[in-house]
């Protein structure tokens, strides 16, 4: 039996959900909508994101005026794109824990990060069985430099451990 796996991976979307170039008012060449339309939605494809969703674009800035509600909108967009798994990027902490957890709680996708502890909705690892019977282990890591870069008040109750040892431990679990 042929057991193929297709992985579609994005990272650093930074709220660029549309391909609209806001400066010119014309379609641009980037944005989640440009690549998400080509994602296969079958039982042997995993759609993954490496984080940095909540901050960066003019639209993300507009959403950040009401960050908890804005995070729900970002999650809805990711849901429409059909993501299965995401991890947390360093900029996903920028709007605080409540905003991050709002985003994660409204996702259809599961969030995996082997080195983030204390945030609701984060799993260390996951295993899925594809339609063709292939079992796939999934994990992610978040840069531990978040501990240096992020405002301490945005990390209250959250620990971001060293990435490489956490990834090695997750691999052993899988």
Predicted regions: what is each one?
Residues 1-174:
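Acidic, metal/ion-coordinating pockets
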